[in-house]
Swiss-Prot record:
Residues 362-397 are annotated as: Disordered. CDD domains: HATPase_MutL-MLH-PMS-like, MutL_Trans_MutL. The keyword Transmembrane does not apply. This is DNA mismatch repair protein MutL.
């Protein structure tokens, strides 16, 4: 047989063998196109598991009439134009093959309108040469793609489709993954005329946990530990489930994204597994929803036909970065909580209200229960939040679901040794260790609190500063030092070097480890609260402060560091506020008894109440 150029339809069908595996593959490609077009709402209609109909409608920017024919051509795209673009891809699609491949194995119709056009246009390809026909149509700004009779002209491919239910489950899973990647987009999914999923867009902040719970379930939400980890151009955020409470059902939740693109990457999975291996059994798997952001120049996404895998230019650095981030939040969660004081605890005691609220609703009343091993969460670093705080981000959280959280809080820790009965005291004494219930957030950084009928305002940045100081101040043992993935090397003067050497023992108690030579100092480890700070700014400022001191007390240094740390929250959510106050109540009980003026201010409602009654 002589060498010959294949007809366009046959060439597209060959390409479709890589891109279009099943109906879910079509949905993935088309929804990603909608996201690249800037859509904020995407409606997906499926019939018979996608074999009969796949319809994707969005409100994106649309496609111009003159470009509709090109949109259905192979290797035609608006997302890259040069090799430099290919090496720094930020869009989800870039090859320009999807529409041509899909149209070659189905009856595809593309209808679109841009904001500049007065009318919409419809395009479809047919025949051996895939000639494109364009005609007027009625359509709002945006694009609709209809894929009818998938694999109608390739019986062998159609024969390998599974049952309608199985194929739709694959589509449902794809939409779940996409919904987790884009919290700012409303996505609805219908099957055979019935709405099956509806994920509404949520703003930044605590509302994200609402969608997380809707997609991954309350079981994952209960055990979710938040991660915020950064180094240079690398950022890791998301949630990982507490390995001590991972179940086979939870282990199915393994979602990872690189620059917003869903991935199944062995390197990432290995790093997460390695971080959790000491807490997981041999037959257990970690559960996680993680987002890795990296300089697009440092990752190659053009290595897999369906773009499910990537190749990192510095794979070892990425692996260790993810490993350190996950390990850090797990170690923090498993730390032994510090006692509130040396006095014995009363037998029946009130749970701090913010912890009860975390399990039921925002306005839960104080609850009294028998003493059990408390599931205290360590102070959060880098924005991480204990599992019990997540439901507070969900307005109108259902009471029945809250029962699960209350049972979780009342479950004794298995390793805790039973204590002998102690004298009972009124529960009101323990309740004095609580600031009260968080009602709402005011002016983005103040919490409105209610306690015993009294209203007060609490400054969240000030509370965060006190918490950081408590975390940094060494107790009977020094603060745990966290090795830096990449040590920080700084040039110092002779005076600064002398001050550092004098303060070395005090800094070691704070978890700051360094090594100095003739003109440089290398910071090798810092305490956990400093890991997410910009150390290239903070450490030189700390060295300058030490150079002006004659006495080096760990407490004074911890106070200075706490005052100079950058807040991780430009705008606070309810969940973050409740978590913060719960940790302040645990580590800084003296602030509850005698709060400083800059932390807490009472709000007098009596004049307003009197004015209302006088009316």
């Amino acid at each position: 047989m002589p060498i010959q150029v294949l007809p366009p339809q046959l060439a597209n069908q060959i390409a479709a063998g890589e891109v279009v595996e099943r109906p879910a593959s079509v949905v993935k490609e088309l929804v990603e196109n909608s996201l690249d077009a800037g859509a904020t709402r995407i409606d997906i209609d499926i019939e018979r598991g996608g074999a009969k109909l796949i319809r994707i409608r969005d409100n994106g920017c649309g496609i111009k009439k003159d470009e509709l024919a090109l949109a259905l051509a192979r290797h035609a795209t608006s997302k890259i134009a040069s090799l430099d673009d290919l090496e720094a891809i930020i869009s989800l699609g870039f090859r320009g093959e999807a529409l041509a491949s899909i149209s070659s194995v189905s009856r595809l119709t593309l209808t679109s309108r841009t904001a500049e056009q007065q009318e919409a246009w419809q395009a479809y390809a047919e025949g051996r040469d895939m000639d494109v026909t364009v005609k007027p149509a009625a359509h709002p700004v945006g694009t609709t793609l209809e894929v009818l009779d998938l694999f109608y002209n390739t019986p062998a491919r159609r024969k390998f489709l599974r049952t309608e239910k199985t194929e739709f489950n694959h589509i449902d899973e794809i939409i779940r993954r996409i919904a987790l990647a884009r919290f700012d987009v409303t996505i609805s999914l219908s099957h055979n005329g019935k709405i099956v999923r509806q994920y509404r867009a949520v703003p930044e902040g605590g509302q994200k946990e609402r969608r997380l719970g809707a997609i991954c379930g309350t079981a994952f939400l209960e055990q979710a530990l938040a991660i915020e980890w950064q180094h240079g151009d690398l950022t890791l955020r998301g949630w990982v489930a507490d390995p001590n409470h991972t179940t086979p059902a939870l282990a199915e939740i393994q979602y990872c994204y690189v620059n917003g693109r869903m991935m199944r990457d062995r390197l990432i999975n290995h790093a997460i597994r390695q971080a959790c291996e000491d807490k997981l059994g041999a037959d257990q798997q970690p559960a996680f929803v993680l987002y890795l952001e990296i300089d697009p120049h440092q990752v190659d996404v053009n290595v897999h036909p369906a773009k499910h895998e990537v190749r990192f230019h510095q794979s070892r650095l990425v692996h260790d970065f993810i490993y350190q981030g996950v390990l850090s939040v797990l170690q923090q969660q498993l730390e032994t909580p510090l006692p509130l004081d040396d006095e014995p605890q009363p037998a029946p005691r009130a749970i701090p209200e913010n912890r009860v609220a975390a399990g039921r609703n925002h306005f839960a009343e104080p609850a009294v229960r028998e003493p059990v091993a408390p599931r205290y969460s360590p102070a959060p670093a880098s924005g991480s939040r204990p599992a019990a705080s997540w439901p507070n981000a969900q307005p109108g959280y259902q009471k029945q679901q809250g029962e699960v959280y209350r049972q979780l809080l009342q479950t004794p820790a298995p390793m805790q040794k039973p204590k002998a009965p102690e004298p009972q005291e009124p529960a009101l004494a323990a309740n004095s260790q609580s600031f009260g219930r968080v009602l709402t957030i005011v002016h983005s950084d103040c919490a409105l609190l209610e306690r015993d009928g009294n209203i007060s305002l609490l400054s969240l940045p000030v509370a965060e500063r006190w918490l950081r100081q408590a975390q940094l101040t060494p107790g009977e043992v020094p603060v745990c030092a966290q090795p830096l993935l990449i040590p920080l090397r700084l040039k110092v003067s002779g005076e600064e070097k002398s001050a550092l050497e004098k303060a070395q023992s005090a800094l070691a108690e704070l978890g700051i480890d360094f090594q100095s030579d003739a003109q440089h100092v290398t910071i090798r480890a810092v305490p956990l609260p400093l890991r997410q700070q910009n150390l290239q700014i903070l450490i030189p400022e700390l060295i300058g402060y030490l150079a002006k001191q004659s006495v080096f007390e760990p407490g004074n240094i911890a106070q200075w560091i706490a005052r100079n740390l950058m807040s991780e929250h430009a705008q606070w959510s309810m969940a973050q506020a409740i978590t913060l106050l719960a940790d302040v109540e645990r580590l800084c009980p003296q602030l509850v008894k005698t709060p400083p003026g800059g932390l807490l201010q009472s709000v007098d409602l009596h004049p307003a109440i009197k004015a209302l009654k006088d009316e």
